[in-house]
Amino acid sequence: MYFHPLHSPDSSLIGYLLADLDEQEAVVIDPPPRQTELVLALLTERSLRLCHVLRTHVHRADAADCSALCDCTSARLVVGEAAALPQDCSREAMRVAHGARLVFGNEVVRVLGTPGHTPGCLSYLWRDRLFCGDAFDVGSCSAGNREADPGLLFDTLTRRLFTLPEQTLVFPAHPIRGRHVATLGELRARYAPRLQQSRDGFITDMMQRRA
């Protein structure tokens, strides 16, 4: 087992490199922009073959950068079924849905459909670790992000993510209140006041905050 966070020096973005050292196969989740050389160096250092580039989500504004690592390795880009991609990326991408399993070496990553921040958002569950992208970014709904859907986000949090074990370690694409990792139990307690209301109440609350 090998786990290496990838921190962008010029943004708050965080990516993650996972590997099976025995089988020398790896995947990378949400590699930050301009970190391709670093990822390649880490792969070379341990003689790893990159199998997949896993994206939790792709915003229209930065879609062009989504396959940079795939262009210089044999890795396959993996995105959600509803992810917006430029045509040159879309032809090569593997689109996956909730319940899919991705294998690298003897390791398995489970795919969870977690729409809300964007329609095509995915989360990836590996061992006791959840890589959730911006699935907990409630602020994007209240701020009026056009790709965000508060109803879908409510469903994702209450029916999918918060049904996982409380000890699950959550690794986001951006720090959550300054933290790079939290347990699911901690996040459940933090978000409880907003999620104790009904789905319609949550949507209304988000829409009112946009005003």
Question: Each PLM stretch: what is its role?
Answer:
Residues 28-31, 49-59, 76-81, 114-116, ...:
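Active-site neighborhood of phospho(di)ester-bond hydrolases with catalytic His/Asp-centered motifs
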